């Protein structure tokens, strides 16, 4: 089963499949990421404690 990342962006509750995530980096206690949003680049962030371990393992990798 594919992992989904749930996060808030600009007041909206969003969810993205981890297979669409392109880049992941850490900012303080937050994990930020970009993802493919149907041809556009979407952005998201989730707290380190709420991030799935699959996302944490992608930090710094392309």
Swiss-Prot record:
Keywords: Cytoplasm, DNA-binding. Belongs to the 7 kDa DNA-binding/endoribonuclease P2 family. GO terms for cellular component: cytoplasm. Pfam families: 7kD_DNA_binding. Monomer. One of its GO terms (molecular function) is RNA endonuclease activity. Hyperthermostable. SUPFAM superfamilies: Chromo domain-like. This is DNA-binding protein 7.
